[in-house]
Each structure stands twice: as structure tokens, then as C-alpha cells.
């Protein structure tokens, strides 16, 4: 059993100092931008129906963190072009998000990381990139990427001039990998992201890095991005104010 831990902690504090990354590393700046997407009529109808259902759920019982996050993610899924029905099936909705992503890529010079959360989106993104830029232009890094291919894909992205894009999930690629050849990071949707920003912004990066959020207008997307950027706990924030201000 360890003893006197409080005393040890106080002693260590007198000889230690907390230093932030930006204070000790000479890294180029981060730039942030948003690309706005207009919901299709089908999306807007589905979003409004889900919004009404979410309000009914949250007004009808004690609000919990899990309840809030579930409703927010259901709304966000619709802005991404799909949602999970009550029977568990995934329903696809016509949407403009992939079109806007391809517009961003067309305007992007150099290499780009594209983070997405849903497997169907990753597949769709890769198919669209291959169609425009060719099969050697993109690699993946997510849960279904075989372990033996993951490091090879990183090396290809870092060293092969023809490989301009890497598509992955922040759950798999947001920690512990280096992707400093990228000077653009695009968030296709709005899941956990703060650690994933630094896959491109770390030692070895010599260019400024631009972070692009794809945001559906007049939806929960805008609030989610602001909360993530400000490092706000989304569930506690929503519990502390009117939900209608978020959705």
C-alpha cells in the first residue's frame, strides 16, 4: 500500500512545471474554416421530424447525458445523409455533403486527411476520390483496415507523392500516428476531434495546417463544432440550457 501520496505530490510540484505544446514547439499556425452545406428537401423533412421526436423524448422524462447525446447524434446523422430507423435498419437520404467534400478537395493543394465516423461514409468518400483522382491517390486507416496494412498506408501517404489523401476514423487514427505531409485536415462529420487535429500538427510539420469542418446550415452541426472547438462538454452544456437552442 502506498503512503504519503499527498506529500509526495506536493514535493514533486515544487520541481515541475506544466508546459503546453505551443509553448515549447516551434510549429506553424493552425487555420480553421467552415464549409456550409444546404440540406436537401428530403433531409430537411427527416431532420424536422427527428427534431420534433427528440423534443418529445426529452420533454417526457428526466434528461440524462446519454439521452441528450443520443438525440444529438441522431440529428447529426441525418445531416450526414443517413439515420438508423427504429427497426435497426440504416436509411440513406440524398445529401450534398459528399459533393461539398469533393469541391474542397478540388481546391486543396498538397495532401489532405479526411476524418469520418461512419463506415458507409468512408466507403463513399474513397469511391468518389478514386473515381476522380485514381486508385493510387488514397489510402484508408480505420477499424476495417487490416493491421498489417496500417503502417504501410501511413508510409505511402507520407512518402508517395501520388498518394494525396488518407481517409480514416478518429477512433482509429486520432491517436499515436504521424501524418505531417498533410497541410489540410477535413472533418466530414463532427465526432471526437481534438486529438486528431494533432496528427498533422506536430514535430516535422513545416507548413501551416488548415482544418475544414463541413457544416449543414440551420442544424445542430454549428453548435457541435463550436463546443468541440471551445472544449465544452456537450452533454452538460445542453442540460444547462434550452435544447431548442441547440437543435
What are these regions (language model features)?
Residues 122-126, 151, 165-208:
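SF2 helicase motor core recognition
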Residues 113-115, 123-126, 132-173:
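Conserved helicase ATPase core of P-loop NTP-dependent helicases/translocases
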Residues 1-90, 94-110, 211, 228-233, ...:
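Inter-lobe coupling linker of SF2 helicases/translocases
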Residues 192-247:
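A conserved SF2-helicase RecA2
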Amino acid at each position: 500500500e502506498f503512503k504519503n501520496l499527498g506529500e509526495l505530490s506536493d514535493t514533486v510540484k515544487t520541481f515541475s512545471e506544466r508546459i503546453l505544446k505551443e509553448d515549447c514547439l516551434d510549429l506553424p499556425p493552425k487555420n480553421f474554416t467552415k464549409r456550409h452545406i444546404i440540406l436537401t428537401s428530403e433531409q430537411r423533412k427527416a431532420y424536422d421530424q427527428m427534431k420534433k421526436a427528440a423534443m418529445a423524448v426529452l420533454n417526457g422524462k428526466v434528461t440524462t447525458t446519454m439521452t441528450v447525446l443520443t438525440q444529438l447524434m441522431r440529428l447529426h446523422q441525418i445531416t450526414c445523409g443517413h439515420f438508423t430507423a427504429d427497426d435497426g435498419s440504416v436509411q440513406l437520404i440524398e445529401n450534398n455533403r459528399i459533393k461539398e467534400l469533393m469541391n474542397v478537395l478540388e481546391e486543396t493543394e498538397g495532401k489532405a486527411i479526411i476524418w469520418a465516423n461512419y463506415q458507409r461514409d468512408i466507403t463513399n468518400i474513397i469511391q468518389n476520390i478514386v473515381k476522380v483522382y485514381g486508385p493510387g491517390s488514397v489510402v484508408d486507416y480505420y477499424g476495417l483496415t487490416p493491421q498489417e496494412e496500417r503502417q504501410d498506408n501511413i508510409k505511402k501517404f507520407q512518402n508517395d507523392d501520388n498518394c494525396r489523401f488518407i481517409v480514416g476514423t478518429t477512433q482509429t487514427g486520432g491517436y499515436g500516428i504521424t501524418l505531417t505531409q498533410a497541410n489540410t485536415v477535413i472533418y466530414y462529420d463532427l465526432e471526437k476531434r481534438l486529438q486528431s487535429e494533432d496528427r498533422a500538427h506536430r514535430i516535422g510539420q513545416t507548413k501551416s495546417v488548415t482544418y475544414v469542418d463541413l457544416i449543414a446550415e440551420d442544424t445542430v452541426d454549428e453548435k457541435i463544432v463550436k463546443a468541440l472547438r471551445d472544449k465544452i462538454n456537450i452533454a452538460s452544456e445542453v442540460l444547462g440550457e434550452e435544447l431548442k437552442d441547440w437543435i
